Swiss-Prot record:
InterPro entries: Period_circadian_regulator (IPR050760). Forms a heterodimer with timeless (TIM); the complex then translocates into the nucleus. The gene is per. One of its GO terms (biological process) is negative regulation of transcription by RNA polymerase II. Phosphorylated with a circadian rhythmicity, probably by the double-time protein (dbt). Phosphorylation could be implicated in the stability of per monomer and in the formation of heterodimer per-tim. This is Period circadian protein. Keywords: Biological rhythms, Cytoplasm, Nucleus, Phosphoprotein, Repeat. The keyword Membrane does not apply. Essential for biological clock functions. Determines the period length of circadian and ultradian rhythms; an increase in PER dosage leads to shortened circadian rhythms and a decrease leads to lengthened circadian rhythms. Essential for the circadian rhythmicity of locomotor activity, eclosion behavior, and for the rhythmic component of the male courtship song that originates in the thoracic nervous system. The biological cycle depends on the rhythmic formation and nuclear localization of the TIM-PER complex. Light induces the degradation of TIM, which promotes elimination of PER. Coiled coil: none annotated. One of its GO terms (cellular component) is perinuclear region of cytoplasm. One of its GO terms (molecular function) is transcription corepressor binding. Residues 93-114, 247-256 have a biased composition (Gly residues). The keyword Nucleus applies.
Length: 390
């Protein structure tokens, strides 16, 4: 009796099966042989095995190949005992034939070896001893099977822990796996924005590409845009006016487009480094779109002299209602406003081109409406005038 759970139902029924068999007193024995003689022959065969191999009957029976698992103990023992009674029924009645019958039931190997064992009467002490041996044997097998399963569970748990260690978060996987060419917001949030300052001695003027709208006047922005070639596009406000959504403005600004092309050619001939280290918002690695992929209404803006890095988030310009009346005009505020850079204009530059285009072509901007614009570099003169008047 142990606190461990028994491995099978047959272990619980083993003693019960033995008692049930001996209490049934099978009628197969002949009349001249009394049933105790049959029982003594069975016990003599069992004790003969015990004396020869120091194993209990079912243990020896299992070792000789009768039943390989504990689940077959009861059926094996029943077959074993019925074979003994049948051989006794054959009329031989000796312990030798009983053993041969036992060998037949147990695999045929044990019949000849234990024929010389003396018959032992079946007593209660022998049965108790046999039961104790079988209980120890069963518990030993049960512990072994549990030990094997426990080792397997430990191994599987260790393997799972190793897999977790191998695939766990390493030093580079703290915030998830990043894509190859992307830049996170963390690393570049505090970096200064690099402005591309142009040479003031060039023919296109010294306006930086990243325009500071709040500190520049509308007239200087128009001139700077016409010279830089970012706004050489701006030189054609007719072409730039196509940003308002008017379909025919591309054709209207074609005359100014020639001036734009001349200004951009002049800009490229001056040898100014246009596409230097441009590091602008946002910090995502946005692919540099070629100028041909820009909207057709803004082809005057994106000339071949530079390749803009378009923003993921479009820039919105808001024109208040109070300034909308003066927004198309190219009025010059007081010249005391601070400018970021000195502007040197060449003789071939026409600073009045964008103003004339803005005056000849009325811009249909609605007051109080947000207008998106696809480029970071190009600022519409109407929006520039509105912000300059503030």
């Amino acid at each position: 009796s142990s606190t461990e759970t028994p491995p099978s139902y047959n272990q619980l029924n083993y003693n019960e099966n033995l008692l049930r068999f001996f209490n049934s007193k099978p009628v197969t024995a002949p009349v001249e042989l009394d049933p105790p003689k049959v029982e003594s022959s069975y016990v003599s065969s069992a004790r003969g095995e015990d004396a020869r191999s120091t194993l209990s009957p079912v243990q020896g029976f299992e070792g000789s190949g009768g039943s390989g698992s504990s689940g077959n103990f009861t059926t094996g023992s029943n077959l074993h005992m019925s074979s003994v009674t049948n051989t006794s029924n054959a009329g031989t009645g000796t312990s030798g034939t009983g053993n041969s019958g036992d060998g037949g039931g147990g695999g045929g190997a044990d019949g000849t070896g234990s024929g010389a064992a003396p018959p032992v009467t079946l007593t209660e002490s022998l049965l108790n001893k046999h039961n104790d041996e079988m209980e120890k044997f069963m518990l030993k097998k049960h512990r072994e099977s549990r030990g094997r399963s426990g080792e397997k569970n430990k191994k599987s748990a260790n393997e799972a822990m190793k897999m977790l260690e191998y695939s766990g978060p390493g030093p580079g996987h703290g915030h998830g796996i990043k894509r190859g060419g992307s830049h996170s917001w963390e690393g570049e949030a505090n970096k200064p924005k690099q402005q591309l300052t142009l040479n003031p001695s060039g023919g296109g003027g010294g306006m930086p590409l990243l325009l500071d709208i709040t500190h520049t006047s509308s007239s200087t922005q128009n001139k700077g845009l016409a010279g830089v070639g970012v706004g050489g596009a701006g030189g054609g406000v007719g072409g730039g006016g196509s940003g308002t959504g008017l379909g025919g403005n591309g054709n209207v600004g074609s005359g100014n487009g020639n001036n734009n092309q001349a200004s951009t050619n002049q800009y490229t001939q001056s040898g100014l480094p246009c596409t230097q280290n441009i590091n602008l918002w946002p910090p995502f690695s946005v692919g540099i779109t070629t100028p041909t992929s820009v909207l057709s209404s803004h082809t005057a803006v994106a000339q071949s002299s530079f390749s803009p890095q378009h923003s993921l988030f479009p820039t919105f310009y808001y024109i208040p209602a109070s300034i909308a009346a003066s927004s198309p005009s190219g009025t010059n505020p007081s010249p005391n406003r601070p400018h970021k850079h000195a502007h040197v204009h060449s003789s071939s530059e026409k600073p009045s081109t964008s103003q004339a285009a803005a005056a000849t072509m009325p811009l249909q901007y609605m007051t109080g409406v947000m207008y998106p614009h696809p480029s970071l570099f190009y600022t519409h003169p109407a929006a520039a005038a509105a912000t300059a008047m503030v």
